[in-house]
Amino acid sequence: GTESGATDALAQEETSFGALYGEALPVDVPDDHYRTFYEVFVYSFYDSDGDGIGDLNGLVEKLDYINDGDDATTTDLGCNGIWLMPIMPSPTYHKYDVTDYMAIDARYGTMEDFDRFMAACEERDIHVLIDLVINHTSSKHPWFTQAVSYLQGLGDGEPSAEDCPYIDYYNFAKEKKAGSWYQV
């Protein structure tokens, strides 16, 4: 009874951002309700230089497979969006532990290769999203390594964000906690 009635009432309400939060949407927000995204793991998509690892130039080379820019053809997937898994430098193949948020992993190419990819997407009206992992970093990220070095040299003193601002970016513990799955 009531659960179904509540669901029906909710379905009848306007569920736009403005209705939910009492604010108008900014003018420049794209309407992505009808966009089809193709998620790409660059590492395994297409290798253009024969090193066994996919790269941005390989993605550009095979972009016509995703969208050739011609609505009249039926030989592409017709996707009008690409969602790139992380492409920033990282010690792991999946790139979900970033070491530099402002760079392209060298195995994938250069910033110029990325610019070429973006230009090719723009020619085809393909929108691009990049998976940006900001809730954690690599244990090799300079912020983390500086915080660890600072804490190791601290001894029994109390850490100070004035001495090392990066200590507040992470949750450090002096003792190993039960159930902890990873030790750096």
Predicted regions and their residues:
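Bacterial Sec-dependent N-terminal signal peptides
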Residues: 1-19
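Acidic/aromatic-lined carbohydrate-recognition and catalytic surfaces
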Residues: 14-184
